[in-house]
Amino acid sequence: MAAVGARWGRRVGYRRRRPLPALVVLVALVVLSGLLWTRVFGSVEDIDAATTCNPPGAPTAPPEVSGQPAQVPLGTMLERDALNSTTPVPPQDVHVRVLNGNGESRQATMVGDELASLGFSKGGADNDSVYVNYDLQCHGQIRFGAAGMSAARTLSLIAPCAQLVRDEREDAAVDFALGADFDDIKTTQEAKQVLQQLQNWVPQRDHQEGAQQEVTPPQISEDLLTKARDVHC
């Protein structure tokens, strides 16, 4: 019995766990997290760089020689998210003039036709009176005044790589200047959904205006608006 008591009374030594595997996992998680955040910030910086345009150069020849319109001031270049808090309007309320800022023949006309097929109001095509040397080195610019912020917001949903530029115009018309990097209208499925929802809202707006009621703005998901502009530029 004494032997049995001695066996059960023996203190079992504490087995110390080696911390190395847990430490390796922790380090790996920290490194992975750092890589993910680097990619996030890198992608933001990349798209900011891709959507930033050069300032216009001075005219190389006077208008009477070049055949170009007299150069006008550019306006203020804005951040890509400058209109994120602005409510878009239906595309048929957006009067868009497409400008040739890159020297590509007939491109502005074809883009204007494509915008019309998406429901935008045609404002014609013309040569750019800001980048008169056709030296717009980016995807393009959306130019607007204070009255055209909502219209510019709508256009930016299907031209998410274009830089936003605010100028001193007084009407709600918007200019879409095409740059050297422009390849096509980038209409995501989410952007098409937003345009359709805006068009579906028009009868409600017209009814409220006809009844002299306060117009309820369109209810568009913020997540949908964000995804509409989530493209590679």
PLM features per residue range, with description:
Residues M1-C233:
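Residue-level signal for protein termini and structural transition zones
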